[in-house]
Amino acid sequence: MRTTATSPLSRFALVFALCGLIAACGSSGGGDGGAGGGGTVEQEAIQGKVIDGYIDGALVCNDLNANGRCDGSDPRTTTDSGGVYALNVPKGSTAPLVAEVIAGQSRDSDQPGVPVDISYRMASPSPAYSTSITPFSTLVHASGERNFSLAEDLVRAELGLPPRFTITMTAPADAGSLTQAVAKSIVTTLKTTAGTLDLSAANALKTIVAAFPPALNELPQLRITTKGNAPIVSKEIYVDATFSLTNPAASVQTYDLNGKIRGRGQSTWGQPKNPYKIQFTSDASYAKVPDFLGMKKNRNWALLADYFDRSLIRNKLALSLGSSSAFNDGLKWTSSGQHVEVVLNGDYVGVYLLTEDIRIASSRLNIKEMSDDPAVNDLDGGYIVEVDVRLDCYRGPDLDLQLITPQQVPFCIDTPDEEAITVNQLAYVKDLLRQVEQDLYGPNRIEKINPASFVDWYLIQELFRNNDAIFVSSDFMWKDTQAATNPLDRLLNMGPLWDFDRAAGNVNYFNNWETEGCWVSKPYQPNWISKLFDNPDFLALTISRWKQKRPALEAFVNFSIDTYARRLVVAQQRNFQRWPIFGLRLTNYYVFSSHDEEVAFVRRFLNERMAWLDKAYASPEAFNAMCK
């Protein structure tokens, strides 16, 4: 928190207000641009906290020479019993804040009255990022990334936390929470590395990660036992089951749950390693669960098998990218997924992605859930629809959730489903889809859609060259009520993203193993995306958003690939001992003999693809020549 020099602060304010009058107290050491011409440096007062618990007796400084410690002429102070500090710093200082937690002197409120046993340092990358100095802000600082939202994305990945997990701390985390457990593990690491860690070094984050305790490296485990060990043979009929979910990173590591399970999926269903749909029972056991591996609590989940994807990272990478700071301004919500190792009826069945399924809920796509009472006549949202060439949705004598538009685009009305939708709601959403299409193919207007959502969805799909994204299947859209707070939510939005296991070169048809050439923008079949590019405003928006997102996109993709591979290094060996499919041709064009080679191909494909798309998105003329 920044304050004016006359604002009331803690007991330290007066000292540093006076210090600001003395040139030596506030002189810059050259690591920050706050000094000017050797004269007196204008000061400003900041106030913050040092937090794991509240840290009392920690030395805090503005690290003007950026050497990762409090020394020289760095303005400094000491925290009080509430972890609070007040400090005068050069006005506009972008230099890091460093907290030195001192053995025998500093105390953590999580262990009242007990001095800290080992000295360690924490940091915040700058006062502008946060004046709270925490275990998480230390990793953000150690990343060296000055795009702080991107840095938080990267830190979450290293910690095995889902994309939307909050890592900002303004107070100690709740006792027993995942946040508290992970923060404690980070502090353990900072103590372990205290003698060698240089917080100012370019490789500081790598040094910290290399010393992570097992709790931050091991994958969670999900043990499923069906009633009577019954086999799961249907995508429609659930089997009762019990579930035991263990997260090594959490304080309470294991939760036992009741529920049911069935098959799911299309091409992967029927393969040796099957995908599943899980629904937990809302009972006393479920009530005790605060979250699912850091993902928001919900009863409904998908277990993605990723059988065809021998890197095991394509779905997680694409979904995490959609949730990242690079794309979450255009895509309102994207499913999160966490890698788990699954044991089914005592049989180890490999690495899966425990994934939020697509549904309207406060913990998922947070738009209005309409009344199913015809008398209410709730019509204008929210809806979820899917483009699906299989038309795999309900069609009965009274209700038909299938729609083939005049341009032959095949839709399924996903939400509300056949048990909840009213006749008037069904008519409303079908008419909306026809109107949007008529605007696109007639006067080429886009007033009824949120163009940023269509652009961002397209950019990720085109980057991954996703075979299904030309309006084949798993291409979702949604609309909220006309009373939604955000006006863009009242329009038809593209998303959420889904189904990337056979993307990023992992397919042997339509040349989609190649990194050059546009795919989603081509009119291979009825495809609104292709038609949208006839609108010059949509094309201009696509080019500008690509250029805006490009630096963060490349950093996120490469960093995440490294991180996922690191976290999978042991578990993938068990997965492929169970499923020895390296060297086999499934749906893939290229054949590789190891997990390392599979991961390297994903990296090469996406980096070469980004480089090619740079050329395609260089200008409208380039796009029209290369992508239409």
Regions of interest found by a model, annotated:
Residues F243-A249, I313-G330, N424, Q438-Y441:
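Zn2+-dependent metallopeptidase catalytic core
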Residues C25-A215:
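Feature for extracytoplasmic/surface-facing segments of secreted or surface-associated proteins
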Residues P214-L317:
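Conserved NTP-binding catalytic cores of kinases and kinase-like/nucleotidyltransferase enzymes
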Residues P213-Q221, G228-I232, Y255-L257, G265-S267, ...:
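Middle-to-C-terminal accessory/interaction subdomains
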Residues A13-A23:
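Bacterial N-terminal signal peptides
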Residues Q279-S285, D291, K296-Y307, G330-W333, ...:
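Internal "kinase-insert"/substrate-recognition segments embedded within catalytic cores
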Residues S325-E341, N466:
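Short, well-structured beta-strand/strand-turn elements
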Residues R2-L14:
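Bacterial N-terminal signal peptides that target proteins for export
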